[in-house]
């Protein structure tokens, strides 16, 4: 059975230097060399082929499975769901359109049934109309009869008046003619009697002739009257005048008998009274008979005109077949095109949206595939870099690896971006956390689902609003056309019944109209008017004949004839014209019904049909509740979209809530907690135990005056004045020194820490390392002053202050370099009091003034220093050029036993630097110059403090060996060569935090990266690890007690460097600040 071979370690061919020895220990551990770096050649050996090897599965997903899973990425799932919703809405819209058309047809069928009822409406309208028509017609017949009777009565009176006028005129004419003539004759006889006798003969003959003529006239008149009275069977006889012989007149005078005869004739003329009575009877009898006949006729006609002669429409239109036929007629061509057009527009809108969503889905999937490939490549390169760094540094950080695996792209590209927008490491760390929070799959899925869904629904609503506006604009014309169609069809359905009814009614009215014209007006016109006209004409003819017979041939004929025409002839002529007009217009025209008598008017039909048409296609007024089935269709589609938009809006609101929560967390951890605690006056509890602000009895702005401030280091380095005891440590508990390469450091640059190029060698920059150390020590008072005044260069504490608490050892320094890292309570600097309550500006100003004033020793301090110098004595324990021992005060100079000084007012005193570097143990059995153990060994060996002599302020000790303090930098041995950095062309840093910002100046940070070579007065790292030691007169051995290699420098360089340090100006002067 063969076991799979473990895959060989992959070697990047770009990192192989051809023609160079193999990288084996110890060369692989060295990064510093006096020679320049060996250049890379373009030659790269080919990598071994792996085509024949079988690649087994890994416990992680490779690129192909990741690309396969992008089909169901959280970015694509919302689009797939949205497409499914669009398809479902499209199908539901089509089905809804079909159901709405069915609803319209059903409504039309209901309208047909209603129209069938409307079709029967003429029957009931005809019945009511018949009643009113009968009543009106009967009243008209009675009124016409009454009018005729009144007219006949009037005509009768007028005819009587005319006949009486004619009669009286005739009698007056006769009276005038006969009596006048007789009067003339009588007068003439009397005249003739007085005349000559001879003329009597002629007179007698004339008289006889005249009498004969008069007899003829009378007889003629009587004959004419008798012709008139024959109508009433009346005959008038007038005797004739006898013609006398008048023989006696011959030769006789006129006798009186002639005159008497004339007078008798005159008195015997007729008066025509009988004629008047006969004329009245002739006229009155026919008129009375005519009035009676008209009256009876009108009553009989009015009574016979009733509902029996008028027909009404039948109820046969209520049958089912008629309703079905009417439904087919009304609904066969009903306009439902607007519903179809709207459904097609919605379907087209949904199809376009679905197509665009599919296209967008494909594009996003392609982008996700490219993104996944890029993320996989970046993660693979990052893992390779992390593996190389772990192999080189021997450290690991699993949480950094988690961040890389979760968000490799953020880890790769966020460092540069965050470095531009945020200068504080804590802010960059918080922003990196915020980006990881937002890039979590849950947040991403929620964002993409809500955002894509909301935008797609909103775009559809915008298009739907345009479609809705178009549908509303065309609704008015559709409603008008539908209403006109329905009105026309409804009127056509009722027109037949109305036509039948109107025809039957008009026929009945025509029959009665004929009866009225023939029976009422016909008898009167034919009987009365014509007869009366004939009678008048005949009467006037007879009168003329009588006048002609009486006065014809006489001088009175023409005047009498003219007189008769004026009085009687013109009246008879006008009466004839009147009777002729009555005969021509003696008829009536009764009103008839039109064919649409039973149809509703257009306004009424519109009132009936408009709500039905509006229910089918909408009223077109744009109202929310009156859009008809088209509005229902659009509202259904719109309501479904609005519900989905609300759902996606809620999801987007949830994502915004999560965004605000994450932003609040970032703000809270970026200074919000400290500001909140400061406002409440409560100290922040976020600092680690033992690193919070101390409970000091002095004001906070005077804290730097205590014996724990690095200002005393500068004074001790410039003016050495003996020793005073440090604070008593009653009990000591060993504090483990943690690994200086702590990978979980919050202020670490990235998941791997790129070293500075100067840190590769044991000394870095040979000419400037000590200078930078001294600059860092001199900058410490300025830093403290800025902290004191409430201003600080950075709010980030150094890793040496926060993460590397060293074990306290005995020292005679006023301020030990281990004090900042002590696990015991200490006065907190401004960097550790960021969350404490800020002082008022008055306190700040007063503290700053007092702090500047305290930079310089007071007069009492200078006098005390002078007295101390005079009190010093030389002993054999002294060394160096001065041979001045330390001024001792029993119980105060040495640490040990139970001697603890009482609390004193903080005053500046001069002390030496840390005595652990080089000191002389006077009471040790192992010799004058015993070897001082490291701190860890001193703590484990029950180290007892021993008195030592302080050394002068000389950088060149007199011993060839001495105590070496372990380095507190990120590497155990500052002289050990570090592995080479990764090539720049392979990858860039995945950092999201820029280079570490300490609370000290820029020079102090640079010194911390160069093996920890700093000034003894610096409180951050150890200077003594690289302290030069005298070996011979011309050489100085450096780093004797280190495990790594060693190096030497010329003594002249050391002396020159020390001389530069001595000649350096006051660190508190302006020149020094300009030099920085």
Swiss-Prot record:
Glycosylation sites recorded in the entry for this protein: 235, 251, 266, 295, 306, 476, 496, 526, 533, 548, 602
Transmembrane regions listed in the UniProt entry: 67-87, 139-159, 351-371, 433-455, 647-667
Extracellular side, ranges: 1-66, 160-350, 456-646
Membrane-topology descriptor: Multi-pass membrane protein
Biased composition range(s): Basic and acidic residues: 997-1010
Biased composition (Polar residues): 874-886
Source taxon at top rank: Eukaryota
Location, primary (coarse class): membrane
Similarity annotation: Belongs to the PRM1 family.
Name of the molecule in the record: Plasma membrane fusion protein PRM1
Protein's organism: Cryptococcus neoformans var. neoformans serotype D (strain B-3501A)
Taxonomic classification: Eukaryota, Fungi, Dikarya, Basidiomycota, Agaricomycotina
């Amino acid at each position: 059975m063969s076991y799979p071979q473990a895959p060989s370690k992959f070697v990047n061919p770009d990192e192989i230097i051809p023609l160079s020895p193999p990288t084996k220990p110890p060369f692989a551990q060295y990064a510093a060399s006096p020679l320049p770096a060996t250049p890379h050649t373009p030659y790269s050996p080919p990598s071994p082929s792996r085509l024949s090897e079988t690649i087994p599965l890994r416990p992680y997903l490779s690129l192909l499975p990741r690309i396969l899973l992008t089909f169901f990425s959280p970015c694509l799932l919302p689009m797939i769901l949205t497409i499914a919703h669009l398809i479902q809405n499209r199908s539901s819209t089509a089905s809804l359109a079909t159901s709405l058309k069915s609803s319209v047809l059903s409504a039309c069928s209901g309208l047909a049934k209603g129209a069938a009822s409307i079709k029967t409406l003429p029957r009931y309208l005809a019945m009511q109309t018949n009643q009113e028509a009968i009543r009106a017609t009967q009243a008209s017949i009675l009124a016409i009869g009454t009018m005729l009777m009144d007219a006949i009565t009037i005509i009768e009176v007028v005819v009587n008046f005319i006949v009486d006028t004619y009669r009286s005129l005739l009698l007056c004419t006769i009276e005038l003619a006969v009596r006048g003539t007789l009067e003339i004759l009588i007068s003439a006889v009397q005249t003739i009697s007085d005349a000559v006798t001879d003329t009597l003969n002629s007179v007698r003959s004339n008289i006889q002739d005249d009498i004969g003529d008069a007899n003829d006239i009378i007889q003629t008149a009587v004959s004419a009257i008798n012709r008139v009275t024959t109508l009433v069977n009346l005959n008038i006889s007038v005797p004739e005048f006898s013609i006398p012989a008048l023989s006696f007149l011959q030769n006789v005078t006129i006798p009186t008998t002639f005159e008497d005869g004339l007078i008798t004739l005159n008195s015997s003329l007729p008066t025509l009274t009988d004629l008047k009575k006969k004329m009245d009877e002739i006229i009155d009898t026919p008129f009375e008979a005519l009035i009676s006949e008209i009256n009876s006729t009108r009553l009989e006609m009015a009574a016979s005109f009733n509902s029996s002669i008028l027909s009404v429409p039948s109820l046969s239109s209520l049958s089912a077949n008629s309703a079905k036929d009417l439904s087919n007629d009304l609904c066969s061509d009903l306009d439902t095109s607007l519903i179809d057009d709207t459904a097609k527009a919605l379907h087209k809108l949904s199809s376009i949206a679905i197509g665009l969503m599919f296209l967008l889905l494909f594009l996003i999937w392609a982008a996700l595939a490219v993104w996944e490939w890029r993320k996989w490549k970046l993660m693979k390169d990052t893992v390779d870099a992390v593996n190389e760094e772990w192999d080189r540094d021997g450290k690991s950080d699993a949480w950094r690896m988690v961040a890389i695996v979760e968000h490799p792209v953020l880890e790769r590209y966020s460092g540069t971006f965050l470095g531009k927008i945020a200068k504080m490491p804590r802010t960059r760390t918080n922003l990196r956390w915020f980006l990881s929070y937002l890039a979590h799959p849950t947040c991403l899925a929620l964002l993409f689902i809500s955002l894509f869904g909301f935008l797609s629904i909103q775009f559809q609503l915008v298009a739907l609003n345009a479609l809705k506006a178009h549908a509303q604009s065309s609704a008015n014309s559709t409603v008008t056309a539908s209403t006109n169609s329905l009105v026309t069809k409804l009127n056509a359905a009722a027109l037949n019944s109305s036509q039948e009814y109107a025809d039957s009614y008009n026929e009945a009215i025509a029959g009665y109209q004929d009866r009225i014209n023939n029976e009422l007006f016909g008898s009167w016109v034919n009987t009365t008017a014509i007869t009366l006209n004939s009678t008048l004409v005949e009467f006037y003819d007879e009168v003329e004949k009588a006048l002609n017979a009486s006065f014809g041939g006489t001088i009175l004929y023409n005047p009498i004839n003219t007189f008769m025409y004026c009085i009687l002839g013109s009246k008879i002529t006008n009466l004839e014209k009147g009777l002729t007009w009555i005969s021509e217009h003696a008829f009536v025209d009764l009103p008839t019904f039109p064919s649409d008598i039973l149809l509703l008017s257009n306004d009424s039909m519109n009132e009936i049909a408009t709500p039905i048409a509006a229910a089918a296609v909408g009223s077109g007024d744009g109202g929310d509740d009156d859009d008809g089935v088209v509005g229902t269709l659009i509202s259904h589609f719109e309501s479904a979209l609005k519900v989905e938009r609300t759902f996606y809006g809620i999801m987007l609101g949830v994502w915004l809530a999560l965004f605000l929560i994450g932003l609040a967390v970032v703000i809270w951890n970026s200074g919000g907690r400290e500001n909140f605690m400061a406002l409440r006056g409560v100290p922040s509890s976020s600092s680690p135990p033992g690193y919070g602000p101390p409970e000091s009895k002095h004001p906070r702005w005077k804290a730097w005056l205590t014996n724990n401030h690095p200002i005393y280091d500068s004074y001790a380095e410039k003016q050495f004045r003996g020793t005073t005891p440090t604070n008593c440590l009653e009990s000591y508990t060993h504090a483990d020194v943690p690994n200086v390469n702590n990978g979980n450091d919050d202020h670490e640059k990235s998941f791997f820490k790129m070293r500075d190029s100067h840190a590769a060698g044991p000394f870095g920059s040979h000419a400037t390392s000590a200078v930078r150390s001294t600059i860092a020590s001199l900058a410490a008072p300025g830093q403290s002053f800025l902290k004191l005044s409430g201003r600080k260069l950075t709010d980030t504490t150094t890793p040496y202050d926060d993460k590397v608490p060293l074990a306290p050892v005995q020292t005679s320094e006023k301020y030990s370099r281990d004090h900042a890292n002590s696990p015991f309570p200490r006065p907190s600097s401004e960097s550790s009091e960021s969350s404490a309550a800020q002082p008022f500006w008055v306190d700040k100003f007063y503290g700053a003034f007092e702090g500047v004033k305290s930079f310089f020793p007071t007069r009492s301090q200078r006098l005390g220093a002078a007295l101390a110098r005079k009190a010093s004595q030389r002993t054999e324990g002294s060394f160096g050029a001065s041979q001045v021992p330390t001024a001792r005060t029993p119980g105060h100079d040495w640490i040990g036993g139970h001697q603890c000084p009482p609390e004193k007012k903080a005053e500046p005193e001069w002390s030496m630097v840390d005595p652990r570097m080089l000191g002389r143990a006077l009471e040790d059995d192992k010799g004058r110059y015993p070897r001082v153990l490291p701190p860890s060994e001193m703590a484990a060996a029950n180290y007892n403090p021993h008195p030592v002599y302080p050394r002068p302020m000389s950088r060149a000790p007199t011993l060839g060996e001495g105590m070496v303090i372990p380095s507190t930098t990120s590497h155990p041995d500052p002289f050990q060569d570090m592995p080479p950095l990764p090539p720049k062309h392979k990858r860039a840093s995945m950092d999201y935090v820029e280079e570490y910002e300490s609370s000290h100046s820029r020079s102090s940070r640079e010194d911390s990266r160069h093996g920890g070579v700093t000034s003894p007065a610096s409180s951050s790292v150890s200077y003594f690890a690289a302290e030069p030691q005298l070996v011979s007169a011309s050489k100085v051995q450096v780093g004797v007690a280190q495990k790594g290699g060693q190096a030497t420098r010329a003594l002249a360089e050391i002396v020159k460097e020390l001389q530069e340090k001595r000649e350096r100006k006051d660190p508190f002067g302006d020149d020094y600040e300009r030099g920085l």
